[in-house]
């Protein structure tokens, strides 16, 4: 049985349960490795959980001069290793998803490792085990496609000319017909939508 991690942004209700649970993970030293991002804060309360996407070719590891970031055989990109990490911030700047964070208390880059101590044993990550809306889901592809027939998982992201494939899946509308998430286009669409909404507000004043 191939267990996978899925993020369904449309289901996030901003409750912060995942953030609280993540900080309780034994390997996180009381720090949460997940955070909620406001999609368009000036006009919306919509949030999306931000976890490490565990890239097939992790940029964070590629730019690390100390070879402190390792990827497991099953595709999980791990937190930097303390004896090697020199706190240079290269990984923080290089990640296209903005995930790695430098923890000043430990002089160490720490990030979501998909609760590897749990998932490698077939258990759910802490965040997915407490998410009340199913925005974070750990299970088989067959299960989630059966439960959510209007959505489908994709794990390819386009950043301009760069294509990134990840271990973590993003749920998108099935009728959209997209083969990947065009990140820059989505950001442009968000900006256009915000401008149109603000124009309509001022027109009514």
Residue ranges and their predicted role:
Residues 1-205:
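Non-ligating segments of multi-cofactor redox enzymes
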